[in-house]
């Protein structure tokens, strides 16, 4: 397996696991407090429906939504970078930096820690922009 492809695969796997953890985090708080916003879920545990989700669940849902705005872009740009054979060293560094930045972003989002959340978001965004520029250069 190509070294860069292997690194990309590891980053994709790490991001998948990170997103899975956010789902489990939400589920943990829903189950712990038996607090559900869906009628069928509340009925299943013999509780009334909550007017709104718990604060921890809402925050995790926002972190998840932010992931859905950024991580698919990484999947596409990363695959294109490999296919277009952008420089391995820089591309690999960007893959790792993006993955670490997204993990830090999630932790700081769940903890409500500014300015660290914005800094982590900015690092991840910068990685995407540099990947896009490298792809553009490879195409021209």
Language-model features: locations:
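Long, highly hydrophobic alpha-helical transmembrane signal-anchor segments
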Residues: 1-25
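Alpha-helical transmembrane segments of multipass membrane proteins
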Residues: 79-83, 103-107, 136
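Structural signature of hydrophobic alpha-helical transmembrane segments
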Residues: 88-97
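Cytosolic, membrane-interface loops and tails of multi-pass inner-membrane proteins
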Residues: 24-62
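Core segments of transmembrane alpha-helices
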Residues: 65-80
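Interfacial loop-to-transmembrane junctions
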Residues: 103-127
């Amino acid at each position: 397996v190509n070294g860069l492809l292997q690194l990309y695969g590891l980053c994709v796997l790490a991001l998948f696991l990170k997103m899975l953890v956010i789902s489990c985090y939400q589920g943990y708080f829903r189950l712990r407090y038996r607090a559900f916003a869906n009628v069928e879920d509340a009925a299943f545990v013999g509780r009334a429906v909550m007017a709104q989700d718990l604060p921890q669940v809402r925050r995790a849902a926002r972190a998840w939504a932010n992931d859905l705005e950024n991580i698919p872009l990484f999947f596409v740009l990363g695959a294109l970078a490999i296919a277009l054979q952008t420089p391995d060293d820089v591309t690999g560094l960007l893959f790792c930096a993006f993955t670490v930045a997204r993990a830090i972003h999630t932790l700081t989002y769940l903890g409500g820690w500014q300015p660290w959340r914005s800094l982590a978001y900015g690092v991840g965004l910068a990685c995407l922009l540099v990947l896009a520029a490298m792809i553009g250069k490879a195409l021209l």
